[in-house]
């Protein structure tokens, strides 16, 4: 469930050790938007996508791959949510629903709900309607605390 909206830099939040999730396509293409920013800063995010999934595999739509970054006291997760099959304005609401059902399992059996930071997933390059996306996130993430990050550069 969405617990708050903040202004910030999701790349910096991941570098600080926060769990994040972002939308991507099924063709190992993370060259623009939030995915592009993340893979430029953390190339292993794209490497995890390529190692854990097949290029152009339609069956990964609605699932995710994950990159684990280790810190001294914990590990942070970057979830690559397959919210659209092809790059561009091709966001699929049903894929997000399935991604969130799977991601929600990450929060099962945890004493404290995990916090996941996300951009306005699917509403940028994917051209999804944020009002619908927001409803999906709230409905399918009862075991998570989601923080939506509206991009604002660090000064």
Curated annotation (Swiss-Prot):
The Macro domain, residue ranges: 1-155
UniProt-listed PROSITE patterns: MACRO
InterPro entries: ADP-ribose_metab_enzymes, Macro_dom, Macro_dom-like
Entries under Gene3D superfamilies matching the protein: Leucine Aminopeptidase, subunit E, domain 1
Pfam families from the UniProt entry: Macro
GO terms classed as biological process: peptidyl-glutamate ADP-deribosylation
Domain of life, per lineage: Viruses
Xref: PANTHER family: ADP-RIBOSE GLYCOHYDROLASE OARD1, PROTEIN C6ORF130
Protein name: Uncharacterized 17.5 kDa protein in tk-vs intergenic region
Organism of provenance: Enterobacteria phage T4 (Bacteriophage T4)
